[in-house]
Regions:
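Amphipathic alpha-helical interface elements
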Residues: 1-186
Length: 186
C-alpha cells in the first residue's frame, strides 16, 4: 500500500508561506537533489510516497506541506500518527499546533540559544509548556519521559545550587516542576 502522493502547491496559490516552500517541494518532486531513492520511487511507482518525500523536508517545510494537503490526507496522517505512537487518536488541531510550534523550538536548539525562556509563535506566546504539549503529540510517551527525566535532572542540579535560581528558571519556562515530573514514566 502506498501512502498519499506528494501534492505540491503551485507558487501562486500559497497563502502565508513564502513561495520558496513550493519551490523546495517541486525540487524534491523533480528530484533536483538527485537522491537515488526518489528516482527509484518515481521511476518504479510513478509517484513519490509521503514517507519518502519527508526524508528531504525540513521541519518547517513539512509543516507547510501538511497545511497544503487535502482534508482527507490530513485525516489519514492523524490516523497514521496515532497508530505509530500507540495512542487512540491524534486530532488535526493537535498536529497542526505541533507542526507550527516545534520548528521554531528546533531552530532555537540548533543555534544554541536559550530554550528554557524562549517564546515562539506569531505573538511570541508559545513557551516551554507549549513545546512540551506539542512534543506529546508527535512522540511516544517513553521518549517524552526520557526528555522530562533529563530536564528534571537539570532542574535538580539547579535546586541543589540555589532554590532561588530554580524558581527563576521555572518561571522563565512557564511551568511548575510537577509539570515536568508528571511526564516521567516510572
Amino acid at each position: 500500500m502506498l501512502l498519499p502522493q506528494v501534492r505540491v502547491p503551485q507558487p501562486g496559490l500559497l497563502h502565508s508561506r513564502p513561495h520558496t516552500t513550493a519551490l523546495h517541494l517541486q525540487s524534491i518532486r523533480d528530484n533536483k537533489p538527485h537522491k537515488p531513492y526518489i528516482k527509484h520511487y518515481v521511476d518504479t511507482y510513478h509517484c513519490l510516497p509521503l514517507w519518502v518525500a519527508s526524508r528531504c523536508l525540513t521541519f518547517g517545510t513539512m509543516s507547510a506541506f501538511f497545511d497544503y494537503q487535502k482534508q482527507s490526507v490530513k485525516t489519514k496522517t492523524c490516523v497514521a500518527m496515532a497508530r505509530a505512537l500507540g495512542v487512540g487518536t491524534v486530532r488535526q488541531r493537535q498536529l497542526e499546533f505541533a507542526y507550527h510550534t516545534l520548528p521554531d523550538f528546533r531552530n532555537i536548539c540548533a543555534h544554541d540559544e536559550r530554550l528554557y525562556c524562549a517564546k515562539v509563535g506569531k505573538n511570541n506566546d508559545r513557551g516551554f509548556a507549549e513545546m512540551l504539549r506539542a512534543l506529546g503529540t508527535v512522540t511516544t510517551a517513553e521518549r517524552l519521559s526520557e526528555y522530562a527525566k533529563a530536564v528534571d535532572g537539570m532542574l535538580g542540579a539547579l535546586a541543589s545550587g540555589s532554590s532561588n535560581l530554580e524558581s527563576k528558571v521555572l518561571a522563565g519556562m512557564g511551568v511548575a516542576r510537577s509539570d515536568v515530573t508528571s511526564l516521567i514514566i516510572s
